[in-house]
């Protein structure tokens, strides 16, 4: 008799294991009771931050290897959070593969500490802040005929702030609409039509989204934006709206990367790091940039005058992460050998797809109402022109949690 394998779907959207007892229960009074253990949670959050950064660069390198002519944009926090949540229902080698593929060494960092870290990370990112719009959420859509393990539902709710929804996957169109509506609402309309088609054999869909909308501490003046050339490669040049500001910046030239490194703060706790390699040095930048270098850039402050040109853009990218994560060692969960019996014991389960969609918009908007003007003192000597008119990297980093929210490469700003 043939073994019947039912399907689970992992969906991740971005803008800008189990023991018989509940892991949340094990952590009760520690990670779950935030008022008594905030410091412990924060420490756990900072413990997983280097792993998240290393995971981000691992994903980046895999995507860059696939194509050097396409934009790259993804949220490592969204991907890691979703798979950490999935690990709560995985067992045996499936469970180990997921956590090790995310970059965690289980002999150095206990699993409970990993989930405490994600719990605090998600809690911190979702704190109301009128200065920036940053929201993240996890939704678990369960086929109405399926019976999920209670401890799994309890864990994903308490540790990963997940909501569970009953859904009829046999009505594929209606199920698709409900999932897409959930993501569109959570991302404030920025992520639409994440799911294009659904398999009727799907038993559950795990959905993660992250949406960020920030305001520059020092905005660009709209009237200074002009159309200029962006050199995609030696053969291709496109016209793009280029923002411009003359002033003081956290900007320096890194000899090791042969690149300009620019940090622009948003109001709140998020910093954007833009890295512009010299002509012909993009490969050198990609080969040498790592978590340690990024941490140094974020720690040390520079004050340099410059005439800055930065493209105004709106890009989005969609990935099926099955291949990329497979190269990082996460294979079993996508195969007939998956052990997800911590999610449901009724039937064998595997993940059929892991879709991730991320969108980035960069524009002039600042912290003040229209017409506000910033005046800065700059040296009398002529400042250098720093023009992001060729492929560059960008990393959005949350300073509170020390985590990379988004990582990307802009090859062509006109590529939607």
UniProtKB/Swiss-Prot annotation:
Keywords: Glycoprotein, Phosphoprotein, Protease inhibitor, Secreted, Serine protease inhibitor, Signal. The modification Phosphoserine is found at residue 381. Residues 1-24 form the signal peptide. Plasma. Glycans are attached at residues 68, 105, 143, 269. One of its GO terms (cellular component) is extracellular space. GO terms for molecular function: serine-type endopeptidase inhibitor activity. The keyword Signal applies. InterPro entries: Serpin_CS, Serpin_dom, Serpin_fam, Serpin_sf, Serpin_sf_1, Serpin_sf_2. Pfam families: Serpin. It is found in: Secreted. PROSITE patterns: SERPIN. Its main location: secreted. Residues 371-390 are annotated as: RCL. The record marks 380-381 as: Reactive bond. Belongs to the serpin family. The reactive center loop (RCL) extends out from the body of the protein and directs binding to the target protease. The protease cleaves the serpin at the reactive site within the RCL, establishing a covalent linkage between the carboxyl group of the serpin reactive site and the serine hydroxyl of the protease. The resulting inactive serpin-protease complex is highly stable. Inhibits human leukocyte elastase, pig pancreatic elastase and bovine trypsin on a 1:1 molar basis. Interacts with CELA2A. Interacts with ERGIC3 and LMAN1/ERGIC53. Interacts with PRSS1/Trypsin. This is Alpha-1-antiproteinase.
């Amino acid at each position: 008799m043939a073994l019947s394998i039912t399907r689970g779907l992992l969906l991740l959207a971005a803008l800008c294991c189990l023991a018989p007892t509940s892991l949340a229960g094990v952590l009760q009074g520690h990670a779950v009771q935030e008022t008594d253990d905030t410091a412990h949670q924060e420490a756990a959050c900072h413990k997983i931050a280097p792993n998240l950064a290393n995971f981000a660069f691992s994903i980046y390198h895999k995507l860059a290897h696939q194509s050097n002519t396409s934009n790259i944009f993804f949220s490592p926090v969204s991907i890691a959070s979703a798979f950490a949540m999935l690990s709560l229902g995985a067992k045996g080698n499936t469970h180990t593969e997921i956590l090790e593929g995310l970059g965690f060494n289980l002999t150095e960092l206990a699993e409970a500490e990993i989930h405490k870290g994600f719990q605090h990370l998600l809690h911190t990112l979702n704190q109301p802040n009128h200065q920036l719009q940053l929201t993240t959420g996890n939704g678990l859509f369960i086929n109405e005929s399926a019976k999920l393990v209670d401890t799994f539902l309890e864990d994903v709710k308490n540790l990963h702030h997940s909501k569970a929804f009953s859904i009829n996957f046999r009505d594929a169109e209606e199920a698709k609409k409900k999932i897409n509506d959930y993501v569109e609402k959570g991302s404030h309309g920025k992520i639409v039509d994440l799911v294009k088609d659904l398999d009727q054999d799907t038993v559950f869909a795990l959905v993660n989204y992250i949406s960020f909308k920030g305001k520059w501490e020092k905005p660009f003046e709209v009237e200074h934006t002009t159309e200029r050339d962006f050199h995609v490669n030696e053969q291709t040049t496109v016209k793009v709206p280029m923002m411009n500001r003359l002033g003081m910046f956290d900007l320096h030239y890194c000899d090791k990367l042969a690149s300009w490194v620019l940090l622009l703060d948003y109001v709140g706790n998020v910093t954007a790091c833009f890295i512009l390699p010299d002509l012909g040095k993009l490969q050198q930048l990609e080969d040498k940039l790592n978590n340690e270098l990024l941490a140094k850039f974020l720690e040390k402050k520079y004050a340099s005058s410059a005439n800055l040109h930065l493209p105004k853009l709106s890009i989005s990218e969609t990935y099926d992460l099955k291949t990329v994560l497979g190269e990082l060692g996460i294979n079993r969960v996508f195969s007939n050998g998956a052990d997800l019996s911590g999610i449901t014991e009724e039937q064998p389960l595997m993940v059929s797809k892991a879709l991730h969609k991320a969108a980035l918009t960069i524009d002039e908007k600042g912290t003040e109402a229209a017409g506000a003007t910033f005046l800065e003192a700059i040296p009398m000597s002529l400042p250098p022109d720093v023009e992001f008119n060729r492929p560059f990297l960008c990393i959005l980093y949350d300073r509170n949690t020390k985590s990379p929210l988004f990582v990307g490469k802009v090859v062509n700003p006109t590529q939607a």
